[in-house]
Amino acid sequence: MSKNFQEPIFDVAQLAHVELLSPKLEESIVFFTKYLGMEVTARAGNSVYLRAYEDFYHNTLKITESAEAGLGHVGWRASSPQALERRVLELEKSGLGRGWIDGDIGHGKAYQFTTPDGHQMEIFFEVEYYKPQPEQKTKLLNRPSKRPAQGVPVRRLDHINLMTSNPGVDTQFMIDTLGFRLREQIRDKGKILGSWISVSNLVHEIAFMQEPNQEKGKLHHLCYWYGIPQNLYDLADLLKDHEYFIEVPPNKHGISQAFCMYVYEPGGNRIELFGDAGYLITDPTWEPVIWEMEDVPGNGDTWIGTAFPDSWWLRGTPVTTKEVVKP
């Protein structure tokens, strides 16, 4: 074993919330509540806050009305107040820090920053925990609220995937400043086309994919977790019957090995649903899995199931108006 082993950084604990932008706010709310079983926990101005029934925090999703679909921001929780201060120092050194805000519904003061590609992010420690109403309390004491009796309810927030003009640069930024660890990666003759990184034993809390037009700051998808593959078939049946577009029906990824499906919410954002956890990483000396792009189609993207459409590789939000070329 090398004596130069780099001590891991455990200052970021988890993906805590994501803000989506939607030009059809109320229709987006219907999708997430009526069909995915999420609960509205607050409204403020032109924003609505939601959570899944096994999310312990006040909210994990904020949807804000906007002219275009896309990403508002990504929120990370630090592992301690001291960890927050350490990460802020590194973010300030990077030149991409934007400064402190007092907080938002569901969390305390936060330090805002951007990725090199311009995705808005923030990191904080103080959070508000969800407090169920009496009728929502469950006898299952390790669950924060009852399983909803509507739709096919998702259980918790899982991960975010962002499109970027330079996946390699954004990946290294997250590794260097926040302590993320590289789990899997797609390369094409040395060029990085996609990275899956995490701060926990999950395969990823965030991924970066190549934006084919070199456009910056795009969202590829937001993912919520079921943990049971059959739930994906139940949801697909429900959504098709109610005329929601399913881009990729229930399927198994090669990269991450997760059972998945992709749909579009009414505002235009791609939403992924996970039917299981894929695989977990507990090895402290994990070597990243490197895929060559030529080996990805039919193996890395889909291991079991239908071939992924070109739109999965090309389309992010906001939607580009340029002609796109598959990476």
From Swiss-Prot:
Coiled coil: none annotated. GO terms for molecular function: catechol 2,3-dioxygenase activity; ferrous iron binding. Its EC number is 1.13.11.2. Its cofactor is Fe(2+). Keywords: Aromatic hydrocarbons catabolism, Dioxygenase, Iron, Metal-binding, Oxidoreductase, Repeat. GO terms for biological process: catabolic process. Fe cation binds at residues 159, 221, 272. It is an enzyme of class 1 (oxidoreductase). InterPro entries: Catechol_2-3_dOase, Fosfomycin_Res_Enzymes, Glyas_Bleomycin-R_OHBP_Dase, Glyas_Fos-R_dOase_dom, VOC, Xdiol_ring_cleave_dOase_1/2. It comes from the Bacteria. It catalyses: catechol + O2 = (2Z,4E)-2-hydroxy-6-oxohexa-2,4-dienoate + H(+). Residues 14-126, 156-276 form the VOC domain. Disulfide bonds: none annotated. Belongs to the extradiol ring-cleavage dioxygenase family. NCBIfam families: catechol_2_3 (TIGR03211). This is Metapyrocatechase. The gene is pheB.
